[in-house]
Amino acid sequence: VGSEMCIRDRHTVRKSFKKLAGVFKKEGGVKNRKGIILFLVAFFLYIDGVYTVIDMATSFGTALGFDSTGLLLALLVTQVVAFPSAIVFGKIAGKVSNELLITISVCAYTFVGIFAIFMQSIWQFWVLAVMVGLFQGGIQALSRSYFTKIIPAEHSGTLFGIMDIFGKGAAFLGTLLVSIVTQATGSVNLGAIPIVCLFVAGLAVFIITARYNKPFIAQSQRLEDEME
């Protein structure tokens, strides 16, 4: 079943790339193609890391001796923390650039991955659950807000559809890599190494894409200021 899901997800991502190429080819007026493509690649990498952390939480908890009740409670804690933190991120986003907040969020998730590598006790798992909750809702909302600023408004519907496809198809790579490393090393903790790599790679691409997107974000900000 897992292999079938991976194959299906790979096909989904491949289709999204083809759809994106079709949009750019059909809509000759779409600007900032490099910035859009690079951001989608960065988004795919770091959001894959986010989904993988969530998916693999059960394995980490079980390895530490959690029963099903404990795992459900940990999941509940994550959701309880995620709701208010998403609201806080939304308020901060009005004062601080989305670029900076996304960078902070990805760095925080990178730390979560590193923390998971060395996690040895149950209390550390609770700390992990809280840390994941702090940034879980914010990073997705911030990514969509950032994407809004770098794409042409007239093509937002199509491009957001492609972004959603990238998000839905981003679950296979991290899970596959974690499974390979875990089976090769026999350690669930070392299985978190690929997660860290996804976040580092995603952050690196995101930093690169900022150079292409800066003028479009500045233009979007000017329009927002004029409307106010």
Give the residues covered by each predicted segment.
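Helix-to-loop junctions at the C-terminal end of transmembrane segments
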Residues: 84-98
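Intracellular juxtamembrane helix-capping segments at the cytosolic ends
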Residues: 138-151
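Short, small-residue-biased leader/transition segments that mark boundaries at the very start
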Residues: 1-7
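Short amphipathic helix-loop junctions that connect adjacent transmembrane helices
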Residues: 55-71
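Multi-pass alpha-helical transporter architecture, strongest
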Residues: 193-228
